[in-house]
């Protein structure tokens, strides 16, 4: 096993522990708490994949961080922070919408790279909007936290989420997954639109009808994928 993979996991475990202590003292806002919950699932998945115990990894991560902090001067820390571009966290969904449990009458699940797509194939003839919470950097989508499909009545009928066992994804991964979800929902004569915020930062453009600018080739590929999976 790559030692860098192990040390990265150990540091991530310790930093999660620190953030959890911050949350326990009620010092975290909604985006902070949301990332904390998502990262916990991701760490569990990575730990299972790597065969590493999280508690043991957390202790090892603490030692790594303490060693780095002893070697780091305040001036070097300031320069490092100044050189790192800051990402922003954008929210289409409320914390309640993100944390709400939902069920499917006719469940369908598909893995597209590092993302998991779930949808209820029982939903027909509905107007649906896709909302997402994600981070952006340099005005481009950086990391998808969670995307969900909502009917006009507020019911959740679809979802795209990162796979805990496969951390890391690109904006292109997200766009492809959105295309698959749209194709699956439209297969049952639903009308789907994407939030303006997601269109702006994933596609850097938006349409009045709420559709991202998918190419004809992408549309054919997405529709074909759904038909072959149904």
Swiss-Prot record:
Keyword Kinase: no
Residue spans of biased composition, Basic and acidic residues class: 218-230
UniProt-annotated stretches for the region CPSF4-binding: 180-215
PTMs per UniProt: Upon interferon induction, ISGylated via host HERC5; this results in the impairment of NS1 interaction with RNA targets due to its inability to form homodimers and to interact with host EIF2AK2/PKR.
Subunit structure: Homodimer. Interacts with host TRIM25 (via coiled coil); this interaction specifically inhibits TRIM25 multimerization and TRIM25-mediated RIGI CARD ubiquitination. Interacts with human EIF2AK2/PKR, CPSF4, IVNS1ABP and PABPN1.
GO biological process: symbiont-mediated suppression of host cytoplasmic pattern recognition receptor signaling pathway via inhibition of RIG-I activity; symbiont-mediated suppression of host gene expression; symbiont-mediated suppression of host mRNA processing; symbiont-mediated suppression of host PKR/eIFalpha signaling; symbiont-mediated suppression of host type I interferon-mediated signaling pathway
Record protein name field: Non-structural protein 1
Family note: Belongs to the influenza A viruses NS1 family.
GO molecular function: protein serine/threonine kinase inhibitor activity; RNA binding
Region of interest: PABPN1-binding: 223-230
Disulfide bonds: none
Region feature RNA-binding and homodimerization, mapped onto this chain: 1-73
Motif Nuclear localization signal in this chain: 34-38
Note on domains (UniProt): The dsRNA-binding region is required for suppression of RNA silencing.
Keywords, ordered alphabetically: Eukaryotic host gene expression shutoff by virus, Host cytoplasm, Host gene expression shutoff by virus, Host mRNA suppression by virus, Host nucleus, Host-virus interaction, Inhibition of host innate immune response by virus, Inhibition of host interferon signaling pathway by virus, Inhibition of host PKR by virus, Inhibition of host pre-mRNA processing by virus, Inhibition of host RIG-I by virus, Inhibition of host RLR pathway by virus, Interferon antiviral system evasion, RNA-binding, Ubl conjugation, Viral immunoevasion
Cytoplasm keyword on record: no
Motif mapping: Nuclear export signal: 137-146
Primary subcellular site in the record, as a coarse category: host cell
Pfam families per UniProt: Flu_NS1 (PF00600)
């Amino acid at each position: 096993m790559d030692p860098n993979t192990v040390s990265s996991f150990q540091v991530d475990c310790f930093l999660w522990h620190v953030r959890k202590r911050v949350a326990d003292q009620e010092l975290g806002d909604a985006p902070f708490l949301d990332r904390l919950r998502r990262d916990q699932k991701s760490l569990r998945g990575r730990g299972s994949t790597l065969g590493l115990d999280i508690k043991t990894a957390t202790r090892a991560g603490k030692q790594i961080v303490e060693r780095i902090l002893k070697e780091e001067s305040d001036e070097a820390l300031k320069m490092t922070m100044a050189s790192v571009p800051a990402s922003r966290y954008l929210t289409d969904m409320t914390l309640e919408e993100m944390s709400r449990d939902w069920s499917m009458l006719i469940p369908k699940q598909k893995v597209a790279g590092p993302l998991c797509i779930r949808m209820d194939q029982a939903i027909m003839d509905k107007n649906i909007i896709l909302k997402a919470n994600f981070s952006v950097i340099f005005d481009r989508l950086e990391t998808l936290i969670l995307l969900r499909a909502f009917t006009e009545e507020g019911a959740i009928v679809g979802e795209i989420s990162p796979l805990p066992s496969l951390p890391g994804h690109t904006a292109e991964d997200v766009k492809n997954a959105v295309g698959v979800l749209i194709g699956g929902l439209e297969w049952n004569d639903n009308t789907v639109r994407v939030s303006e915020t997601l269109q702006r930062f994933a596609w850097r453009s938006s349409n009045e009808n709420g559709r991202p600018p998918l190419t004809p080739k992408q549309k054919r590929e997405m529709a074909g994928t759904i038909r072959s999976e149904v």
